[in-house]
Amino acid sequence: MYKTCVWVLLFKIVLCYEAPPATLEAIHPKGLRVSVPDEGFSLFAFHGKLNEEMEGLEAGHWSRDITKPKNGRWIFRDRNAALKIGDKIYFWTFVIKDGLGYRQDNGEWTVEGFVDEAGNPVNTEGSEITPGVEFTSTSLNPESPQSIPNQPPDNLPAKPPSEGYPCELSLSTVSVPGFVCKGQLLFEDQFNIPIHRGKIWVPEVKFPGEPDFPFNVYLSDNAEVNDGKLIIKPATLESKYGEDFVRQSLDLSERCTGTVGTAQCLREASGPLILPPIITAKISTRHQFAFKYGRVEIRAKMPKGDWLYPEILLEPRDNIYGVRNYASGILKIASVKGNAEFSKKLYAGPIMTGSDPYRSFYLKENIGYESWNNDFHNYTLEWRPDGITLLVDGESYGEIKPGEGFYNVANSYKVEAAPQWLKGTIMAPFDELFYVSIGLNVAGIREFSEDISNKPWKNSATKAMLKFWDARSQWFPTWDEDSALQVDYVKVFAI
């Protein structure tokens, strides 16, 4: 079985320790016992539901942290559980070993018999079963990974180090159970194995849409790992599907990661409304890792080529404040447009609406001596409960402070979502869980302003995508091997 290991969470990819599978026992006449052998743990946690599947890593009907072993085992005991033959328990467990956490995920166990307090199989009348009769006490879903390293459960109260915490607790929180230590590495991927094997990233398969409406479709084939780097390349739709395919239809529904039945998964060309003529890719940690507050470091080489721009983002996992027009915000970690005339301008920061002037109100710029896409650079975004700091190669170039809240300025610009942010903290909408996403976009109706002299389309025009495609003899020659977005590593630290 392939296993993963991390500092704090799921995501430093090396072979490592595997949490022991739990043994579940139905006690006669009443009760449930769950245990694992003591292998030097400092904590054991059990979370489960009776006859109801778990929703991810929820607490469950049973939610207990055990801090001491007994007779060589860590034991959870519910003396009031009234179980019967055929009942099914869905569960996950968690252990801490040598300061790192490990989970047994997606556990399923069906009551097939009972034991007494000593663990001897008994019948429903309470008499001991004759030795030799088979008795099954534990079962796992074989299709699911059994052990995924992570950090200790976050439903534990904050305790000082003297009461069991080995560190100063962080302001950061994460999407999987765990206390977080200040400065601790939460996530790391150095892209040493294919994306699908790590099972950390989800490649998007869909047509991106509002509010930016880029002129590309995301397909998984255009993201690959090569020589320790993530490579995302642009390619024409015709290179994959044939000449003039932009005037056909493309149905991604069977593997679409967007909303099936919408334009995210199915497009049909009609007159001047052609299909997005470029294929790119986007990957995200949406299903595996999200966090609130931390420092993101990404070493990347930006793409060269007209009308290309990278999307290196933090995106909201739950869209608490709304879905449309970035109502729940996005954080640009770094972006550089691929056109030569823009390649010395690095920009990043928070975006909270789809259109200017407020869209770019908080974006910060760093004008380089040379083009940012000539080489790899270290791009950093530090996200705190009181603001955001942007750095490149260790040098700060931007600071964003919310003041009394982002609402005040947004409301003066008549941003529709602004009143929703009053429900949160002064950092709203940036006070919820966000995940990491990395992608490549082409053109669209927001990133390139109308005053660019050689731009072949108007953002507001119905024929915008067609005009872009018809001008390919102008921009396509600027694309080559350097037009790929290359990422060396991604790291997320607690603050």
Curated annotation (Swiss-Prot):
UniProt entry keywords in alphabetical sequence: Glycoprotein, Immunity, Innate immunity, Secreted, Signal
GO molecular function, one term: pattern recognition receptor activity
Source organism (scientific name): Bombyx mori
Effect of substituting residue 63 to A: Decreased binding affinity to curdlan to less than 90% of the wild-type
A Pfam family reported for this protein in Swiss-Prot or TrEMBL: CBM39
Domain GH16: 188-495
Location(s), subcellular: Secreted
Protein name: Beta-1,3-glucan-binding protein
Major localization class: secreted
Signal is among the record's keywords: yes
Ranges where the record places region Binds to curdlan and laminarin: 17-118
Induction profile: By bacterial and yeast infection.
Annotated GO CC locations: extracellular region
Result of changing residue 109 to A: No effect in binding affinity to curdlan compared to the wild-type
UniProt-reported outcome of changing residue 75 to A: Slightly decreased binding affinity to curdlan compared to the wild-type
Binding site for substrate: 65, 92-94, 103
Recorded consequence of changing residue 70 to A: Decreased binding affinity to curdlan to less than 80% of the wild-type
UniProt record similarity statement: Belongs to the insect beta-1,3-glucan binding protein family.
InterPro entries per the UniProt record, alphabetical: BGBP_N, BGBP_N_sf, ConA-like_dom_sf, GH16, GH16_GRP_C, Glycosyl_Hydrlase_16
